[in-house]
Amino acid sequence: MKVLALRHSVAQVYADTQVYVHDDTKDSYENAFLISNLTTHNILYLNYSIKTLEILNKSGIAAIALQSLEELFTLIRCNFTYDYELDIIYLHDYSYYTNNEIRTDQHWITKTNIEEYLLPGWKLTYVGYNGSETRGHYNFSFKCQNAATDDDLIIEYIYSEALDFQNFMLKKIKERMTTSLPIARLSNRVFRDKLFPSLLKEHKNVVNVGPRNESMFTFLNYPTIKQFSNGAYLVKDTIKLKQERWLGKRISQFDIGQYKNMLNVLTAIYYYYNLYKSKPIIYMIGSAPSYWIYDVRHYSDFFFETWDPLDTPYSSIHHKELFFINDVKKLKDNSILYIDIRTDRGNADWKKWRKTVEEQTINNLDIAYEYLRTGKAKVCCVKMTAMDLELPISAKLLHHPTTEIRSEFYLLLDTWDLTNIRRFIPKGVLYSFINNIITENVFIQQPFKVKVLNDSYIVALYALSNDFNNRSEVIKLINNQKQSLITVRINNTFKDEPKVGFKNIYDWTFLPTDFDTKEAIITSYDGCLGLFGLSISLASKPTGNNHLFILSGTDKYYKLDQFANHTSISRRSHQIRFSESATSYSGYIFRDLSNNNFNLIGTNIENSVSGHVYNALIYYRYNYSFDLKRWIYLHSIDKVDIEGGKYYELAPIELIYACRSAKEFATLQDDLTVLRYSNEIENYINTVYSITYADDPNYFIGIQFRNIPYKYDVKIPHLTFGVLHISDNMVPDVIDILKIMKNELFKMDITTSYTYMLSDGIYVANVSGVLSTYFKIYNVFYKNQITFGQSRMFIPHITLSFNNMRTVRIETTKLQIKSIYLRKIKGDTVFDMVE
C-alpha cells in the first residue's frame, strides 16, 4: 500500500486506486487506521494531515505529501522505499527497460565488454550506489532516486551454470516482469544502510550473523562490526580432495577478472577487520587497471597504493613500475597486500610459459612471506597456480569466480599462518580445488555458535532458520538475548509443517508463540522498517518465503500506537469479504455464531469478540506487522500508552472468545497452523491474565424493567447482567463498583425484538444494547480481583417462563430500566439502586 497525499483532487483515473478524504471529525490516528484498512494498492489522500502521514510511515506504510502531477505519476506507477526521516524516495522502477537499457551500480562492469552480449540495440548504464546518479532525473519537492538495477541478475549469471548471457538476461527480465519478487529483496540494501549506523550509535559491540555478497559494500564503513559466516576453506581441508587435471572451463562470456580481483581484496579487508577492527592501507601489486577501486572508494574512504607498469586510474598513489621483493620494506604496518602478478602467455611455448608461471608463483609467495615476516597487523592475498607446493595448513584458499576456470587460485595469509605447520599439497589436489570449489562469499569468518552474547547487539538477518542450527537453541537465543534483531522463517504452511524446503536447504518454521521474549517486538519486514525510519509501498506477500523480525531490547517496545501497531489489521478481511459470502458483516456473523451467540441483531455494533485478535490470528499470513503478543501483554499489565484513535479497552474474556472463533475458522479451513496459533495465543492470554470464572456463582446483578412487551409467568422478569463468585465481605466492593458505573448502566440503550426457547422449558426474550457496558464492568471487576462472569459467552436475555411457549417477533422495543440490584442466589437482595 502507498499513500499519496494531495491538497486537491486530480482528474485522472488510476487503476487499483482509492480516494480518501481526511475526516476532520476523527483524530490523526483514527484517520491513519481507516486509510490503512482500505483495500487498493494506491490511496490518494486528500486534505491530508501531516501527523497522519507520520503515523502511517512509522507503521511501515509509505505515505508522502506530493506537490505536483509529475510526482504523482512517478510514484503511482512503481513501488518504492521511503526514508521518511531524510525525505528520500528510493524507487524500484524497472521502466528503464523501455529505453532498451539495463542498469548497474558497479562501475567496473561498464569497463568490460558486456555490451557485446546484451540484447540487440540495448545498452548498459551506470547509475551509482542505490541509483544516486539518477537524482538529477527527478526535480521533485523531495529527494528521489531510482535504486533499481540489474546487478542481481548479472551476479546471478556469474554464479550460474549458464554461459549464454543474452539468453540468461532475456529469461530473467521476463521473470522480473511477470513473477512476484520479494519486495524485501529490492529494499534490503536501503534498510541495511539505515540499520547499522543507527545501531552503532547506541551499541559499542555489534555482531552480524550470516552476511552475504549483497552486503559486501555495506560493511566497509564498519570495521568494528564482528561478522560470523560459514568459515573459510583451509589448506588442511584439501585432504578430502582427490587429484584431478586441468579442466579449462569458461564461466562468463564477458571478462569478469576485475570482479574476481575485487572479491579477493574485499575478502582480505573483512578478514583484516575481523582481526584488527580498523581500516587498513591497501597495497596492490599487479592487477591493473583495477577499475573496481572506484566502486570500493565510492562506498568508503580507503587508501590504495599500487604498482604496475600499466595505469591504475583510481588508485590513491600509483607506481607505474614493477615491484620486487626488496620493495617490501616500503610497505607499512596496518595494511593489506594483494599480489596479482602473472605474465600473459602471449605466443610463448606452453611448457616455457608454465615454467615461468611456476617461478612467478614461488616469487609471489616469497614476497608474501617477506611482507608478513616483520611488522604488525598485516594480511596478504596472493595469486597462486596449481603446482606442487608446501603451504601453511591454516592458510585460506580462495577461488572467486573469474572468466575461465584454469589453474589459478588465491591464498589468504596472516602473520600467524607464517609460523604454522606446512603441508605438501600435490598439483592434482589443487586442480581438484579449482575445478570443484567456488568461493561464494567475501565473508569467510567463523560460523556463529547459537548462544547468548551478553555484551553485544546481535543482528542475524535470514541466517538462523536453517535446519543445521538446533531449533531449540535458536529459540533459547531469541528468548534470552537482551539486545538483538533476529529473523526466523514464519510458518506459512497450512499443515503446521515444522520445516520447509528452500532452494537446496531446509528451514525451520516459527510462529510468534514459539518465543517467550521479554520486551521484544515481533513484527514483519515492513513493521521493522518503520522502527528504523523507513517505510515501503508494498507489504510482504504470503509467499512462504517470509520472516518474523524479532527486536529485543528496543526502546520502542512501549510505543504501542507508533510501531508494529494495529494498522491494516482488517485489510485482508475487507479484501475478501465480498467473495462467496457477499456481505460486509460476514466476519461479525461468524464470530458471534462460533461462540453460540445467535442474536445477530446489531452484530456489527455489539461485538462480543475482539476483532483485532480474531483478524490477527486467522489472517496472520497477510499482516503480522501487528505484534499481537505485545499488544495482549501490555494490556494485561495496564501499560498501554494510547496516543489517539478510537480506543475501546477489551475485557480479557473478549480475547478468549476471539481465539475460540479463530479455532473454529481454522477447523473449517483445515488450517492446522492457525489452529495451533489460536490455541497458543489463548494459552498466552490465560498466562498473562489471571482470569477466574464464576461458573459456580453465589451472587448476580439483576436489571428490572418498567415495561416487558411480552406475556410472562415468572414473578419478576429481569435481565441477569452477570454473575459473581464472591465472599460476603466482598459485597461492599461490588456495591462500590455498581455505584461508580451507575450513570453508564442507566444510560444503556436496551432493546428487545423477539422471544425464543433458550433450552427445553426455558422461554426467554432477547436483549440488545448491553454488551459493551457488560465488558466494561467486567474489566472493572477484573482489575479489582473480583470473579465476575462465566467461562461460556454471556448471552443477555430475560427469562419469561419455565414452560415451552411459541416464539414471538415484535417491532424493536426500547426497555426502560426500573432498578439495578445485587442479589444473593437463593437469597436476598443486598443492594438496589434506581436512576
UniProtKB/Swiss-Prot annotation:
Region named 2'-O-methyltransferase activity: 246-428
Cross-referenced PROSITE patterns: SAM_MT56_VP3 (PS51589)
EC number(s) recorded for this UniProt protein: 3.1.4.-, 2.7.7.50, 2.1.1.56
Region (N7-methyltransferase activity): 171-245, 429-555
Main location: virion
Region (2'-5'-phosphodiesterase activity): 693-835
Location of the active site: 718, 720, 797, 799
Alphabetized InterPro entries for the sequence: NS2A-like, VP3_Rotav
GO CC annotation terms, alphabetical: viral nucleocapsid
Catalytic activity: a 5'-end diphospho-ribonucleoside in mRNA + GTP + H(+) = a 5'-end (5'-triphosphoguanosine)-ribonucleoside in mRNA + diphosphate; a 5'-end (5'-triphosphoguanosine)-ribonucleoside in mRNA + S-adenosyl-L-methionine = a 5'-end (N(7)-methyl 5'-triphosphoguanosine)-ribonucleoside in mRNA + S-adenosyl-L-homocysteine; 5'-triphosphoadenylyl-(2'->5')-adenylyl-(2'->5')-adenosine + 2 H2O = 2 AMP + ATP + 2 H(+)
Signal peptide range in chain numbering: none
Function: Multifunctional enzyme involved in mRNA capping. Catalyzes the formation of the 5' cap structure on the viral plus-strand transcripts. Specifically binds to GTP and displays guanylyltransferase and methyltransferase activities. Has affinity for ssRNA but not for dsRNA. Capping activity is non-specific and caps RNAs that initiate with either a G or an A residue. Together with VP1 polymerase, forms a VP1-VP3 complex positioned near the channels situated at each of the five-fold vertices of the core.
Family under the similarity heading: Belongs to the rotavirus VP3 family.
HAMAP family linked to this entry: Rota_VP3 (MF_04124), Rota_VP3_A (MF_04128)
Domain notes: Contains a bipartite N7-methyltransferase domain, a 2'-O-methyltransferase domain and a GTase/RTPase domain. The C-terminus contains a phosphodiesterase domain that degrades the 5'-triphosphorylated, 2'-5' linked adenylate oligomers produced by the host cell in response to IFN stimulation.
Name of the protein this chain belongs to: Protein VP3
